[in-house]
C-alpha cells in the first residue's frame, strides 16, 4: 500500500529510544551548620531548587543526557543544607528524525531520569539529618520551551548591530 506519493509508509522503521546506562556523575551535600541546623526551627526553611538539562553526542546514535538539580534550604540567613546532583544517562536514539532529536534528548530522556534523581535527592537530604526532600514533578516541556526562548533571545541580541 502507498500513501499517495508512491512511498510505502510501512517501510520507515519506528523511532527507538533505549536507556544504555544511568549513573551519578556528581553528588554533593553540605550541612554547614550541623549540629545546630538539625534542631527544630520555628519556621520551615525556604528551599530553592534549580533544574537544568544538558545533552551531548557520544556517537552517531548514542547521547549522554545530564539532569542537574541544585538546591539550598535557608532559615533566615542561615543555610540549613545545600546539595547538587548531576545525574546522567546514556541513551541510544535510532530512526529519530533530526527535528525530533532535540525534544527527545531534552524532554523525554530527562523525564526517564527524573524519578531516579528525585530518589537520590530525597535520600541524601534524609541522610543529612533532615526530612526527605520530595521534589515536585518537573514539566520538562515547559523547561525546554523556556530554554529555547532564552537561546533565541540570546541569538537575537548577538545579531543586532551596536
Curated annotation (Swiss-Prot):
GO terms for biological process: protein folding; protein tetramerization; protein transport. One of its GO terms (cellular component) is cytoplasm. Gene3D superfamilies: SecB-like. Disulfide bonds: none annotated. It comes from the Bacteria. GO terms for molecular function: unfolded protein binding. The keyword Nucleotide-binding does not apply. One of the proteins required for the normal export of preproteins out of the cell cytoplasm. It is a molecular chaperone that binds to a subset of precursor proteins, maintaining them in a translocation-competent state. It also specifically binds to its receptor SecA. Homotetramer, a dimer of dimers. One homotetramer interacts with 1 SecA dimer. This is Protein-export protein SecB. It comes from Bradyrhizobium sp. (strain BTAi1 / ATCC BAA-1182). The lineage of its organism: Bacteria, Pseudomonadati, Pseudomonadota, Alphaproteobacteria, Hyphomicrobiales.
Amino acid at each position: 500500500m502507498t500513501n499517495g506519493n508512491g512511498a510505502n509508509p510501512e517501510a520507515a522503521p519506528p523511532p527507538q529510544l533505549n536507556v544504555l546506562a544511568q549513573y551519578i556523575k556528581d553528588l554533593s551535600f553540605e550541612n554547614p551548620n550541623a549540629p545546630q541546623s538539625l534542631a527544630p526551627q520555628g519556621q520551615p526553611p525556604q528551599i530553592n531548587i534549580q533544574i537544568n538539562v544538558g545533552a551531548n553526542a557520544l556517537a552517531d546514535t548514542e547521547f549522554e543526557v545530564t539532569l542537574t538539580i541544585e538546591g539550598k534550604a535557608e532559615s533566615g540567613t542561615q543555610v540549613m543544607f545545600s546539595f547538587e546532583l548531576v545525574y546522567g544517562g546514556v541513551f541510544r536514539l535510532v530512526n529519530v528524525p533530526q527535528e525530533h532529536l532535540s525534544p527527545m534528548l531534552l524532554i523525554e530522556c530527562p523525564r526517564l531520569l527524573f524519578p531516579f534523581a528525585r530518589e537520590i535527592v530525597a535520600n541524601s537530604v534524609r541522610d543529612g539529618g533532615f526530612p526527605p526532600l520530595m521534589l515536585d514533578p518537573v514539566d520538562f516541556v515547559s523547561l525546554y520551551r523556556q530554554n529555547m526562548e532564552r537561546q533565541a533571545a540570546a541569538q537575537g541580541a548577538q545579531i543586532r548591530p551596536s
